[in-house]
Protein backbone atom coordinates (compact mmCIF):
# COMPACT_ATOMS: atom_id res chain seq x y z
CA UNK A 1 0.00 0.00 0.00
CA UNK A 2 1.18 3.52 -0.84
CA UNK A 3 1.13 6.18 1.89
CA UNK A 4 1.50 9.94 1.56
CA UNK A 5 0.63 13.18 3.37
CA UNK A 6 -1.02 16.38 2.22
CA UNK A 7 -2.67 19.44 3.70
CA UNK A 8 -5.97 20.58 2.22
CA UNK A 9 -9.66 21.23 2.72
CA UNK A 10 -11.82 18.10 2.95
CA UNK A 11 -14.45 19.26 0.48
CA UNK A 12 -11.82 19.82 -2.24
CA UNK A 13 -10.34 16.30 -2.17
CA UNK A 14 -10.85 14.49 -5.48
CA UNK A 15 -10.68 11.01 -4.01
CA UNK A 16 -12.77 7.85 -3.99
CA UNK A 17 -13.39 8.42 -0.28
CA UNK A 18 -12.54 10.83 2.52
CA UNK A 19 -12.51 9.71 6.15
CA UNK A 20 -13.62 11.99 9.00
CA UNK A 21 -14.42 11.46 12.67
CA UNK A 22 -17.62 11.77 14.68
CA UNK A 23 -17.59 11.87 18.47
CA UNK A 24 -20.14 10.54 20.91
CA UNK A 25 -22.94 11.59 21.31
CA UNK A 26 -23.35 12.63 17.65
CA UNK A 27 -20.73 15.41 17.82
CA UNK A 28 -18.91 16.30 14.65
CA UNK A 29 -15.14 16.60 14.62
CA UNK A 30 -13.79 19.95 13.31
CA UNK A 31 -13.22 18.47 9.83
CA UNK A 32 -16.70 16.90 9.80
CA UNK A 33 -18.12 20.29 10.80
CA UNK A 34 -16.47 21.82 7.73
CA UNK A 35 -18.15 19.25 5.50
CA UNK A 36 -21.45 19.77 7.27
CA UNK A 37 -21.27 23.51 6.66
CA UNK A 38 -20.41 23.04 2.97
CA UNK A 39 -23.29 20.55 2.56
CA UNK A 40 -25.89 22.78 4.29
CA UNK A 41 -26.22 20.54 7.33
CA UNK A 42 -26.50 17.28 5.39
CA UNK A 43 -24.30 15.31 7.80
CA UNK A 44 -25.77 16.71 11.02
CA UNK A 45 -29.28 15.93 9.76
CA UNK A 46 -28.29 12.28 9.32
CA UNK A 47 -26.89 12.19 12.85
CA UNK A 48 -30.03 13.75 14.31
CA UNK A 49 -31.97 11.01 12.56
CA UNK A 50 -29.93 8.47 14.54
CA UNK A 51 -27.87 7.01 11.69
CA UNK A 52 -24.63 7.25 13.71
CA UNK A 53 -24.13 7.74 17.44
CA UNK A 54 -20.33 8.15 17.28
CA UNK A 55 -19.42 5.14 19.42
CA UNK A 56 -15.88 3.78 18.87
CA UNK A 57 -15.65 1.79 15.65
CA UNK A 58 -19.09 2.71 14.28
CA UNK A 59 -18.99 3.40 10.53
CA UNK A 60 -21.37 5.18 8.17
CA UNK A 61 -20.59 5.47 4.46
CA UNK A 62 -22.18 8.43 2.66
CA UNK A 63 -22.46 8.86 -1.11
CA UNK A 64 -22.56 12.09 -3.10
CA UNK A 65 -22.50 14.52 -0.17
CA UNK A 66 -23.60 17.97 -1.50
CA UNK A 67 -20.72 20.37 -2.15
CA UNK A 68 -18.05 17.68 -1.65
CA UNK A 69 -15.88 16.58 -4.59
CA UNK A 70 -15.11 13.13 -3.17
CA UNK A 71 -17.43 10.34 -4.31
CA UNK A 72 -17.91 9.07 -0.77
CA UNK A 73 -17.46 10.20 2.83
CA UNK A 74 -16.79 7.65 5.56
CA UNK A 75 -17.91 8.80 9.01
CA UNK A 76 -15.97 7.04 11.76
CA UNK A 77 -17.19 6.79 15.35
CA UNK A 78 -14.42 7.90 17.71
CA UNK A 79 -16.11 7.69 21.11
CA UNK A 80 -16.07 10.58 23.56
CA UNK A 81 -13.75 13.35 22.43
CA UNK A 82 -11.93 13.78 25.74
CA UNK A 83 -11.42 10.03 26.08
CA UNK A 84 -9.71 9.44 22.72
CA UNK A 85 -6.47 7.74 23.76
CA UNK A 86 -3.63 5.95 22.02
CA UNK A 87 -5.11 2.46 22.03
CA UNK A 88 -8.53 3.63 20.82
CA UNK A 89 -6.93 5.75 18.08
CA UNK A 90 -5.02 2.75 16.69
CA UNK A 91 -8.10 0.51 16.89
CA UNK A 92 -10.14 3.12 15.01
CA UNK A 93 -7.49 3.31 12.28
CA UNK A 94 -7.52 -0.48 11.85
CA UNK A 95 -11.33 -0.62 11.73
CA UNK A 96 -11.32 2.20 9.17
CA UNK A 97 -8.88 0.34 6.89
CA UNK A 98 -10.98 -2.80 7.18
CA UNK A 99 -14.14 -0.87 6.24
CA UNK A 100 -12.45 0.86 3.29
CA UNK A 101 -11.39 -2.54 1.95
CA UNK A 102 -14.84 -4.05 2.51
CA UNK A 103 -16.50 -1.19 0.64
CA UNK A 104 -14.14 -1.45 -2.32
CA UNK A 105 -12.27 1.84 -1.95
CA UNK A 106 -9.04 1.89 -3.94
CA UNK A 107 -7.85 5.17 -2.45
CA UNK A 108 -8.82 7.42 0.44
CA UNK A 109 -7.84 10.64 2.17
CA UNK A 110 -7.84 10.17 5.93
CA UNK A 111 -8.50 13.14 8.24
CA UNK A 112 -8.37 11.06 11.43
CA UNK A 113 -4.75 12.17 11.85
CA UNK A 114 -6.14 15.62 12.70
CA UNK A 115 -8.02 14.30 15.74
CA UNK A 116 -6.72 15.33 19.15
CA UNK A 117 -5.03 12.43 20.93
CA UNK A 118 -3.91 13.48 24.38
CA UNK A 119 -0.20 14.28 24.54
CA UNK A 120 0.48 13.21 20.95
CA UNK A 121 1.58 15.27 17.94
CA UNK A 122 1.15 14.95 14.18
CA UNK A 123 4.29 12.82 13.80
CA UNK A 124 3.00 10.27 16.30
CA UNK A 125 -0.50 10.14 14.80
CA UNK A 126 0.75 9.63 11.24
CA UNK A 127 3.40 7.07 12.22
CA UNK A 128 0.98 5.10 14.38
CA UNK A 129 -1.60 5.18 11.59
CA UNK A 130 0.95 3.61 9.23
CA UNK A 131 2.05 1.01 11.80
CA UNK A 132 -1.56 0.18 12.78
CA UNK A 133 -2.59 -0.16 9.13
CA UNK A 134 0.24 -2.55 8.33
CA UNK A 135 -0.33 -4.50 11.54
CA UNK A 136 -4.05 -4.85 10.83
CA UNK A 137 -3.37 -6.20 7.34
CA UNK A 138 -0.81 -8.78 8.52
CA UNK A 139 -1.51 -12.44 7.75
CA UNK A 140 0.53 -15.61 8.15
CA UNK A 141 -1.00 -18.17 5.83
CA UNK A 142 1.93 -19.63 3.88
CA UNK A 143 1.26 -23.10 5.31
CA UNK A 144 -2.45 -23.16 4.37
CA UNK A 145 -3.10 -25.32 1.31
CA UNK A 146 -6.12 -23.16 0.48
CA UNK A 147 -5.44 -19.50 1.14
CA UNK A 148 -8.40 -17.47 2.44
CA UNK A 149 -9.67 -14.92 -0.06
CA UNK A 150 -9.59 -11.44 1.41
CA UNK A 151 -10.83 -8.36 -0.39
CA UNK A 152 -8.13 -5.68 -0.27
CA UNK A 153 -8.66 -3.15 -3.05
CA UNK A 154 -7.24 -0.23 -1.01
CA UNK A 155 -3.96 0.75 -2.65
CA UNK A 156 -3.39 4.38 -1.69
CA UNK A 157 -3.93 6.14 1.62
CA UNK A 158 -3.31 9.86 2.11
CA UNK A 159 -3.08 11.31 5.61
CA UNK A 160 -4.11 14.92 5.93
CA UNK A 161 -2.15 17.17 8.29
CA UNK A 162 -3.49 20.48 9.67
CA UNK A 163 -0.87 22.81 8.13
CA UNK A 164 1.61 22.78 5.27
CA UNK A 165 4.52 23.27 7.66
CA UNK A 166 3.76 19.81 9.09
CA UNK A 167 4.17 18.05 5.73
CA UNK A 168 7.86 17.27 6.27
CA UNK A 169 7.09 15.88 9.72
CA UNK A 170 4.32 13.74 8.23
CA UNK A 171 6.61 12.39 5.51
CA UNK A 172 9.24 11.51 8.10
CA UNK A 173 6.55 9.74 10.15
CA UNK A 174 5.58 7.65 7.11
CA UNK A 175 9.22 6.73 6.42
CA UNK A 176 9.76 5.70 10.03
CA UNK A 177 6.41 3.92 10.27
CA UNK A 178 7.01 1.84 7.13
CA UNK A 179 10.49 0.80 8.28
CA UNK A 180 9.22 -0.16 11.73
CA UNK A 181 6.26 -2.02 10.22
CA UNK A 182 8.69 -3.93 8.01
CA UNK A 183 10.74 -4.89 11.07
CA UNK A 184 7.64 -5.89 13.01
CA UNK A 185 6.48 -8.08 10.11
CA UNK A 186 9.91 -9.75 9.88
CA UNK A 187 9.81 -10.42 13.62
CA UNK A 188 6.26 -11.80 13.46
CA UNK A 189 7.09 -14.05 10.52
CA UNK A 190 10.06 -15.55 12.38
CA UNK A 191 8.02 -16.01 15.55
CA UNK A 192 5.08 -17.63 13.78
CA UNK A 193 7.24 -20.00 11.74
CA UNK A 194 6.84 -23.62 12.96
CA UNK A 195 9.80 -25.02 14.93
CA UNK A 196 10.39 -27.89 12.50
CA UNK A 197 11.44 -25.18 10.03
CA UNK A 198 12.60 -22.27 12.20
CA UNK A 199 15.55 -23.91 13.95
CA UNK A 200 18.86 -22.17 14.80
CA UNK A 201 20.17 -22.81 11.26
CA UNK A 202 17.07 -21.10 9.84
CA UNK A 203 17.72 -18.07 12.05
CA UNK A 204 21.27 -18.00 10.70
CA UNK A 205 20.02 -18.19 7.11
CA UNK A 206 17.74 -15.19 7.70
CA UNK A 207 20.67 -13.25 9.16
CA UNK A 208 22.74 -14.05 6.05
CA UNK A 209 19.90 -12.96 3.79
CA UNK A 210 19.73 -9.61 5.59
CA UNK A 211 23.43 -9.09 4.84
CA UNK A 212 22.78 -9.95 1.18
CA UNK A 213 20.01 -7.34 1.00
CA UNK A 214 21.84 -4.39 2.58
CA UNK A 215 25.40 -3.16 1.97
CA UNK A 216 25.56 -1.73 5.50
CA UNK A 217 24.97 -5.17 7.05
CA UNK A 218 27.42 -8.05 7.50
CA UNK A 219 26.84 -11.37 9.22
CA UNK A 220 28.98 -13.91 11.06
CA UNK A 221 27.69 -17.31 12.21
CA UNK A 222 29.22 -19.12 15.17
CA UNK A 223 28.50 -22.86 15.35
CA UNK A 224 29.05 -25.38 18.13
CA UNK A 225 32.66 -26.11 17.19
CA UNK A 226 33.68 -22.47 17.56
CA UNK A 227 31.55 -22.09 20.70
CA UNK A 228 33.49 -24.94 22.24
CA UNK A 229 36.80 -23.22 21.48
CA UNK A 230 35.44 -20.01 23.02
CA UNK A 231 34.42 -21.83 26.20
CA UNK A 232 30.67 -21.20 25.80
CA UNK A 233 29.90 -24.29 27.87
CA UNK A 234 26.67 -22.98 29.35
CA UNK A 235 25.19 -22.07 25.94
CA UNK A 236 26.25 -25.46 24.52
CA UNK A 237 24.77 -27.40 27.45
CA UNK A 238 21.26 -26.14 26.71
CA UNK A 239 21.36 -27.40 23.12
CA UNK A 240 22.95 -30.79 23.84
CA UNK A 241 19.65 -32.66 23.89
CA UNK A 242 18.69 -31.50 20.39
CA UNK A 243 19.92 -32.81 17.04
CA UNK A 244 19.69 -29.23 15.73
CA UNK A 245 23.03 -27.47 16.09
CA UNK A 246 23.15 -24.37 18.28
CA UNK A 247 24.13 -21.32 16.25
CA UNK A 248 24.78 -17.74 17.24
CA UNK A 249 24.27 -15.21 14.45
CA UNK A 250 26.12 -11.89 14.69
CA UNK A 251 24.55 -9.15 12.53
CA UNK A 252 26.67 -6.03 12.26
CA UNK A 253 25.12 -2.80 10.95
CA UNK A 254 27.54 0.00 10.10
CA UNK A 255 25.56 3.15 9.41
CA UNK A 256 28.54 5.29 10.33
CA UNK A 257 31.70 3.29 9.51
CA UNK A 258 33.99 6.31 10.01
CA UNK A 259 32.77 6.88 13.55
CA UNK A 260 34.93 5.85 16.48
CA UNK A 261 31.86 5.69 18.72
CA UNK A 262 31.34 2.38 20.48
CA UNK A 263 28.55 0.23 19.02
CA UNK A 264 25.19 -0.45 20.61
CA UNK A 265 24.67 -4.21 21.02
CA UNK A 266 21.30 -5.99 21.01
CA UNK A 267 21.19 -9.63 22.15
CA UNK A 268 18.11 -11.77 21.49
CA UNK A 269 17.24 -15.07 23.14
CA UNK A 270 16.59 -17.49 20.27
CA UNK A 271 15.21 -20.72 21.77
CA UNK A 272 13.55 -21.95 18.59
CA UNK A 273 11.70 -24.50 20.69
CA UNK A 274 11.73 -24.90 24.46
CA UNK A 275 10.38 -28.22 25.72
CA UNK A 276 11.84 -27.47 29.14
CA UNK A 277 14.42 -30.22 28.65
CA UNK A 278 14.61 -32.83 31.42
CA UNK A 279 12.46 -30.48 33.55
CA UNK A 280 9.76 -31.04 30.94
CA UNK A 281 6.99 -28.49 30.52
CA UNK A 282 3.29 -29.50 30.73
CA UNK A 283 1.87 -30.64 27.40
CA UNK A 284 -0.93 -28.08 27.31
CA UNK A 285 0.19 -25.00 25.42
CA UNK A 286 3.64 -26.41 24.70
CA UNK A 287 3.15 -25.60 21.01
CA UNK A 288 3.52 -21.95 21.96
CA UNK A 289 7.09 -22.59 23.04
CA UNK A 290 8.06 -21.97 19.41
CA UNK A 291 7.70 -18.34 20.50
CA UNK A 292 10.64 -18.68 22.88
CA UNK A 293 12.80 -17.23 20.12
CA UNK A 294 10.84 -13.98 19.92
CA UNK A 295 13.69 -12.09 21.58
CA UNK A 296 15.96 -13.03 18.68
CA UNK A 297 13.12 -12.37 16.23
CA UNK A 298 12.66 -8.85 17.60
CA UNK A 299 16.40 -8.15 17.36
CA UNK A 300 16.31 -9.38 13.75
CA UNK A 301 13.30 -7.16 12.99
CA UNK A 302 15.01 -4.18 14.61
CA UNK A 303 18.15 -4.72 12.53
CA UNK A 304 16.04 -4.88 9.37
CA UNK A 305 14.22 -1.63 10.24
CA UNK A 306 17.56 -0.03 11.07
CA UNK A 307 19.00 -0.98 7.68
CA UNK A 308 15.90 0.36 5.91
CA UNK A 309 16.17 3.68 7.77
CA UNK A 310 19.93 3.86 7.12
CA UNK A 311 20.49 5.50 10.50
CA UNK A 312 23.99 6.97 11.04
CA UNK A 313 24.93 4.72 13.97
CA UNK A 314 26.68 1.38 14.45
CA UNK A 315 24.68 -1.47 15.96
CA UNK A 316 25.41 -5.17 16.46
CA UNK A 317 22.56 -7.65 16.77
CA UNK A 318 23.12 -11.12 18.23
CA UNK A 319 20.63 -13.95 17.63
CA UNK A 320 21.40 -16.60 20.25
CA UNK A 321 19.86 -19.61 18.49
CA UNK A 322 19.38 -22.88 20.36
CA UNK A 323 16.82 -25.64 21.01
CA UNK A 324 16.10 -27.10 24.47
CA UNK A 325 15.08 -30.76 24.17
CA UNK A 326 15.22 -33.82 26.44
CA UNK A 327 17.52 -36.61 25.27
CA UNK A 328 20.29 -38.97 26.32
CA UNK A 329 22.82 -36.16 25.95
CA UNK A 330 20.69 -33.42 27.51
CA UNK A 331 21.92 -31.45 30.48
CA UNK A 332 20.36 -32.33 33.84
CA UNK A 333 19.21 -30.76 37.10
CA UNK A 334 22.21 -30.96 39.39
CA UNK A 335 24.78 -30.32 36.65
CA UNK A 336 27.35 -27.59 37.32
CA UNK A 337 28.36 -25.58 34.27
CA UNK A 338 31.40 -23.37 33.82
CA UNK A 339 30.31 -20.34 31.81
CA UNK A 340 32.42 -18.44 29.29
CA UNK A 341 33.11 -15.84 32.00
CA UNK A 342 34.59 -18.53 34.27
CA UNK A 343 31.74 -18.30 36.77
CA UNK A 344 30.04 -21.58 37.67
CA UNK A 345 26.31 -22.27 37.72
CA UNK A 346 24.41 -25.08 39.43
CA UNK A 347 21.46 -26.16 37.30
CA UNK A 348 18.38 -26.59 39.48
CA UNK A 349 15.90 -26.52 36.60
CA UNK A 350 16.64 -27.14 32.92
CA UNK A 351 13.59 -25.05 32.01
CA UNK A 352 15.45 -21.93 33.18
CA UNK A 353 17.62 -22.27 30.09
CA UNK A 354 17.34 -18.86 28.45
CA UNK A 355 19.63 -17.25 31.01
CA UNK A 356 22.20 -20.03 30.47
CA UNK A 357 22.32 -19.17 26.77
CA UNK A 358 22.27 -15.42 27.33
CA UNK A 359 25.00 -15.39 29.98
CA UNK A 360 27.57 -16.69 27.48
CA UNK A 361 26.27 -14.37 24.75
CA UNK A 362 26.62 -11.42 27.15
CA UNK A 363 30.21 -12.44 27.86
CA UNK A 364 30.94 -12.89 24.15
CA UNK A 365 29.85 -9.32 23.27
CA UNK A 366 32.47 -7.82 25.62
CA UNK A 367 34.87 -8.03 22.65
CA UNK A 368 32.91 -5.29 20.87
CA UNK A 369 33.61 -2.83 23.72
CA UNK A 370 29.97 -1.73 23.50
CA UNK A 371 28.50 1.63 24.44
CA UNK A 372 25.64 -0.38 25.92
CA UNK A 373 24.03 -3.81 25.64
CA UNK A 374 20.30 -4.53 25.62
CA UNK A 375 19.20 -8.15 25.79
CA UNK A 376 15.67 -9.16 24.81
CA UNK A 377 14.13 -12.42 25.99
CA UNK A 378 10.92 -14.28 26.68
CA UNK A 379 12.60 -15.12 29.96
CA UNK A 380 10.14 -15.66 32.80
CA UNK A 381 6.52 -16.62 33.33
CA UNK A 382 6.82 -14.49 36.45
CA UNK A 383 6.87 -11.39 34.22
CA UNK A 384 3.44 -12.35 32.89
CA UNK A 385 2.19 -12.53 36.48
CA UNK A 386 3.81 -9.19 37.36
CA UNK A 387 2.94 -7.11 34.28
CA UNK A 388 0.41 -9.16 32.32
CA UNK A 389 0.38 -9.12 28.53
CA UNK A 390 0.54 -5.38 27.97
CA UNK A 391 3.86 -4.10 29.34
CA UNK A 392 7.39 -5.49 28.99
CA UNK A 393 9.75 -5.62 31.97
CA UNK A 394 13.03 -3.68 32.15
CA UNK A 395 15.94 -4.44 34.48
CA UNK A 396 19.18 -2.49 34.23
CA UNK A 397 22.49 -1.74 35.93
CA UNK A 398 22.50 1.80 34.49
CA UNK A 399 19.81 4.36 35.35
CA UNK A 400 20.23 6.58 32.24
CA UNK A 401 19.95 3.55 29.92
CA UNK A 402 16.79 2.28 31.62
CA UNK A 403 15.28 5.78 31.42
CA UNK A 404 16.11 5.92 27.70
CA UNK A 405 14.37 2.60 27.07
CA UNK A 406 11.28 3.40 29.11
CA UNK A 407 11.06 6.81 27.43
CA UNK A 408 11.37 5.18 23.99
CA UNK A 409 8.64 2.71 24.95
CA UNK A 410 6.32 5.62 25.80
CA UNK A 411 7.13 7.45 22.56
CA UNK A 412 6.49 4.31 20.49
CA UNK A 413 3.41 3.18 22.47
CA UNK A 414 5.21 -0.13 23.02
CA UNK A 415 5.31 0.16 26.76
CA UNK A 416 7.85 -1.10 29.26
CA UNK A 417 8.22 -0.74 33.03
CA UNK A 418 11.39 -0.82 35.08
CA UNK A 419 11.68 -3.38 37.87
CA UNK A 420 14.15 -3.06 40.77
CA UNK A 421 17.39 -5.01 41.13
CA UNK A 422 18.36 -4.59 44.79
CA UNK A 423 21.24 -6.55 46.36
CA UNK A 424 18.81 -8.55 48.50
CA UNK A 425 17.45 -10.36 45.43
CA UNK A 426 20.90 -11.78 44.64
CA UNK A 427 20.71 -13.78 47.88
CA UNK A 428 18.11 -16.06 46.28
CA UNK A 429 20.63 -17.24 43.67
CA UNK A 430 23.16 -18.60 46.17
CA UNK A 431 24.29 -22.21 45.70
CA UNK A 432 26.21 -24.39 48.18
CA UNK A 433 28.13 -26.02 45.31
CA UNK A 434 28.69 -23.34 42.62
CA UNK A 435 29.03 -19.58 42.29
CA UNK A 436 25.28 -19.35 41.73
CA UNK A 437 22.15 -21.36 40.96
CA UNK A 438 20.21 -20.85 37.74
CA UNK A 439 16.93 -20.14 39.57
CA UNK A 440 16.10 -18.26 42.75
CA UNK A 441 12.78 -19.74 43.79
CA UNK A 442 9.24 -18.47 43.20
CA UNK A 443 9.41 -14.97 44.74
CA UNK A 444 10.35 -12.17 42.30
CA UNK A 445 11.24 -14.61 39.52
CA UNK A 446 11.64 -11.92 36.87
CA UNK A 447 13.94 -9.88 39.09
CA UNK A 448 16.13 -12.80 40.14
CA UNK A 449 16.49 -13.80 36.47
CA UNK A 450 17.66 -10.25 35.77
CA UNK A 451 20.03 -10.45 38.73
CA UNK A 452 21.48 -13.64 37.27
CA UNK A 453 22.16 -11.96 33.92
CA UNK A 454 23.63 -8.88 35.59
CA UNK A 455 26.50 -11.03 36.90
CA UNK A 456 27.65 -11.40 33.28
CA UNK A 457 27.17 -7.74 32.29
CA UNK A 458 29.55 -5.96 34.65
CA UNK A 459 31.87 -4.56 31.97
CA UNK A 460 29.32 -2.33 30.22
CA UNK A 461 26.02 -0.50 30.64
CA UNK A 462 23.32 -3.14 30.30
CA UNK A 463 19.55 -3.51 30.24
CA UNK A 464 17.37 -6.60 30.03
CA UNK A 465 13.90 -6.65 28.45
CA UNK A 466 11.63 -9.48 29.58
CA UNK A 467 8.98 -9.86 26.87
CA UNK A 468 7.44 -13.13 28.08
CA UNK A 469 4.04 -11.45 28.40
CA UNK A 470 4.14 -9.26 25.31
CA UNK A 471 5.88 -11.28 22.57
CA UNK A 472 2.84 -13.28 21.46
CA UNK A 473 -0.90 -13.69 21.93
CA UNK A 474 -2.82 -16.87 22.67
CA UNK A 475 -6.40 -17.83 21.87
CA UNK A 476 -8.35 -16.72 18.80
CA UNK A 477 -5.81 -14.00 17.95
CA UNK A 478 -2.88 -16.39 18.43
CA UNK A 479 0.39 -15.21 16.96
CA UNK A 480 3.55 -13.21 17.41
CA UNK A 481 3.11 -9.49 18.18
CA UNK A 482 6.47 -8.28 16.87
CA UNK A 483 7.12 -6.46 20.12
CA UNK A 484 9.36 -4.76 21.18
CA UNK A 485 10.63 -3.81 17.69
CA UNK A 486 8.86 -0.41 17.81
CA UNK A 487 10.45 0.44 21.15
CA UNK A 488 13.94 -0.67 20.11
CA UNK A 489 13.81 1.26 16.84
CA UNK A 490 12.60 4.35 18.72
CA UNK A 491 15.52 3.93 21.12
CA UNK A 492 17.90 3.84 18.14
CA UNK A 493 16.17 6.80 16.46
CA UNK A 494 16.72 8.77 19.65
CA UNK A 495 20.35 7.65 19.86
CA UNK A 496 20.97 8.72 16.25
CA UNK A 497 19.57 12.20 16.91
CA UNK A 498 16.51 11.82 14.67
CA UNK A 499 13.91 14.45 15.55
CA UNK A 500 10.53 12.78 15.94
CA UNK A 501 8.57 15.54 17.62
CA UNK A 502 7.30 18.93 16.52
UniProtKB/Swiss-Prot annotation:
GN (gene name): pepA
Signal peptide (from-to): none
EC number, as in UniProt: 3.4.11.1, 3.4.11.10
Name of the protein in its database record: Probable cytosol aminopeptidase
Predominant place of localization: cytoplasm
Record GO cellular component, one term: cytoplasm
Pfam families in the cross-refs: Peptidase_M17 (PF00883), Peptidase_M17_N (PF02789)
NCBIfam families hit by this protein: PRK00913.1-1 (NF002072), PRK00913.1-2 (NF002073), PRK00913.1-4 (NF002074)
Catalytic residues in the record: 281, 355
HAMAP family from the UniProt entry: Cytosol_peptidase_M17
Family per record: Belongs to the peptidase M17 family.
Keyword Protease among UniProt keywords: yes
Amino acid sequence: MEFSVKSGSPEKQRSACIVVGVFEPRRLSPVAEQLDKISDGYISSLLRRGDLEGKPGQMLLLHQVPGVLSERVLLVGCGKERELGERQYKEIIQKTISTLNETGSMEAVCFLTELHVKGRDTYWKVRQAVEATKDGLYTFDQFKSVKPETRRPLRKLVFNVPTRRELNLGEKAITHGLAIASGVKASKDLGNMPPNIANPAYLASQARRLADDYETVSTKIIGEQEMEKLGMTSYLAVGRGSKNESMMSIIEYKGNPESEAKPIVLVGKGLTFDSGGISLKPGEGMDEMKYDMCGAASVFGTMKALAKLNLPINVIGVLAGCENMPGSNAYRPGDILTTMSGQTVEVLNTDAEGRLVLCDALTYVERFEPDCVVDVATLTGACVIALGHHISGVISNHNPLSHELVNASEQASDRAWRLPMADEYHEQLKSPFADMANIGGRPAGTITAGCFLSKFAKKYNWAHLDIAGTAWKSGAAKGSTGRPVSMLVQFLLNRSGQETEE
